[in-house]
């Protein structure tokens, strides 16, 4: 092992500069400052911060970050000590503790290697894949446990389908009401023409009144269309603007999420590599030279986690607002639809109740003369019977003699 050599191995900083400093942290009620430590004797020449936990003194102060090297505690050097010994040194101090460190001036772009990019692609593929399928394909991955946002995304998709169905149904309903209103208008026009041409005043007035009722129903239908049409606009706004905007935010969130999970997977792989070398008793070059590559990935993971947490917070807030708008909007739209249709049917009922003109008495003989002036004159049944009796009792003129003499009674004689 490198620790058994008589000379020191120079640290391989990968061109990453460090800046020394110190920070005083006030411990919490559990006598902790909120950091985890890695490295140290006997395999690594330096100790460094692996993770800064949320809502702890170190996280709230924001001075130290993952990957920073710890050089001393309260003015005491920790060179050559193990991480367990350094943790005890920090725990022994009550109240405030001063941490001396070398700040790692890392560029996150330097940690975005081809390996991280490929891991992002793999996580994107595995996202919609079951665990059994991923395990069968041998795809290692990092997942978020108890991710409640997944259920929210499923609810968003169901809400989008609901609004899509309501939009289509409302369109069909408006189209049907428009055709119905045009039918009522046609009825009104027909009965109006009949009323104008009806010679009897009572029947004419009844037909005109019935025609006006249908025209009023047509106006009620147009008013219903004008009232419900904004509902369709609001539904389309929610469906085509609000939901796509949320999906775009979710798409950005997923990109940040996959990047964070990729760094988590990379850290896990590097930890496994280090543990394997320790188990075999073989020194690992990057560990023996300061483990700067690992510390760079730790810093990138911390920054990716910060972006992920912020983006997740934004997505949850946007989805919460979207849910509130959905609950309020759907109630308002349905109330508008129900109240408008109720008013439409009540108005139609009132108009038709006042237009109860049936039965209508119509003089068909007079009406026939009025409508058929160019036709043959109408004769009733009694006149037809008299003509039939005459034809049966008296011969026709054609059957009589052309110049037959008259008998004593003045009738024609057969020739």
From Swiss-Prot:
Assigned keywords, A-Z: Actin-binding, Calcium, Cytoplasm, Cytoskeleton, Lipoprotein, Membrane, Metal-binding, Palmitate, Phosphoprotein, Synapse, Synaptosome, Zinc
Binding site for Zn(2+): 44, 46
InterPro entries: AH/BAR_dom_sf (IPR027267), AH_dom (IPR010504), Arfaptin_fam (IPR030798), PDZ (IPR001478), PDZ_sf (IPR036034), PICK1_BAR (IPR037959)
UniProt modified residues of type Phosphothreonine: 82
A GO term, aspect molecular function: G protein-coupled receptor binding
Lipidation (S-palmitoyl cysteine): 413
Residue ranges annotated for the PDZ domain, each copy included: 22-105
PROSITE patterns recorded: AH, PDZ
Subcellular location: Cytoplasm, Perinuclear region; Membrane; Postsynaptic density; Synapse, Synaptosome
Keyword Cytoplasm part of the UniProt annotation: yes
Biased composition annotated in UniProt, kind: Acidic residues: 377-391
Tissues and organs where the protein is expressed, per its UniProt entry: Ubiquitous.
Function: Probable adapter protein that bind to and organize the subcellular localization of a variety of membrane proteins containing some PDZ recognition sequence. Involved in the clustering of various receptors, possibly by acting at the receptor internalization level. Plays a role in synaptic plasticity by regulating the trafficking and internalization of AMPA receptors. May be regulated upon PRKCA activation. May regulate ASIC1/ASIC3 channel.
UniProt xrefs under PANTHER family: ARFAPTIN-RELATED, PRKCA-BINDING PROTEIN
Name of this protein: PRKCA-binding protein
Organism: Homo sapiens
Organism placement in taxonomy: Eukaryota, Metazoa, Chordata, Craniata, Vertebrata
């Amino acid at each position: 092992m490198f620790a058994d050599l008589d000379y020191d191995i120079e640290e391989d900083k990968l061109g990453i500069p460090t800046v020394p400093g110190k920070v005083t942290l006030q411990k919490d009620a559990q006598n902790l400052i909120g950091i985890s430590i890695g490295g140290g004797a006997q395999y690594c020449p330096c100790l460094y911060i692996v993770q800064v936990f949320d809502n702890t003194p170190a996280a709230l102060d924001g001075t130290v970050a993952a990957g920073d090297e710890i050089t001393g505690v309260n003015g005491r050097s920790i060179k050559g000590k193990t991480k367990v010994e350094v943790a005890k040194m920090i725990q022994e101090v009550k109240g405030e503790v001063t941490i001396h460190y070398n700040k790692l001036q890392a560029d996150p772009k330097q940690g975005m290697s081809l390996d991280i990019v490929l891991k992002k692609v793999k996580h994107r593929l595995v996202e919609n894949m079951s665990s059994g399928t991923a395990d069968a394909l041998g795809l290692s991955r990092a997942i978020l446990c108890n991710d409640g946002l997944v259920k929210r995304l499923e609810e968003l998709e169901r809400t989008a389908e609901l609004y899509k169905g309501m939009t289509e149904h409302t369109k069909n309903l408006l189209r049907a009401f428009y055709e119905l209103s045009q039918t009522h208008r046609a009825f009104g026009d027909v009965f109006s023409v009949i009323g104008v041409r009806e010679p009897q005043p009572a029947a004419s007035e009844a037909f005109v009144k019935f025609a006006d009722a249908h025209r009023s129903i047509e106006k009620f239908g147009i008013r219903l269309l004008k009232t419900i049409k904004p509902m369709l606009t609001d539904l389309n706004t929610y469906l085509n603007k609000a939901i796509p905007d949320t999906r775009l935010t979710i798409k950005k969130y997923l990109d940040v999420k996959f990047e964070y999970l990729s760094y988590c997977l990379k850290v896990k792989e590097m930890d496994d590599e280090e543990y394997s070398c320790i188990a075999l008793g073989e020194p690992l070059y990057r560990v023996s030279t300061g483990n700067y590559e690992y510390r760079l990935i730790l810093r990138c993971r911390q920054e990716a986690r910060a972006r992920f947490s912020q983006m997740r917070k934004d997505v949850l807030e946007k989805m919460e607002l979207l849910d509130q708008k959905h609950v309020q909007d759907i109630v308002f739209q349905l109330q508008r639809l129900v109240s408008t249709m109720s008013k439409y049917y009540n108005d139609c009922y009132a108009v038709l109740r006042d237009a109860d003109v049936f039965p209508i008495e119509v003089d068909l003989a007079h009406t026939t003369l009025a409508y058929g002036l160019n036709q043959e004159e109408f004769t009733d049944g009694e006149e037809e019977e008299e003509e039939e009796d005459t034809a049966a009792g008296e011969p026709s003129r054609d059957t009589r003699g052309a110049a037959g003499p008259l008998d004593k009674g003045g009738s024609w004689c057969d020739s």
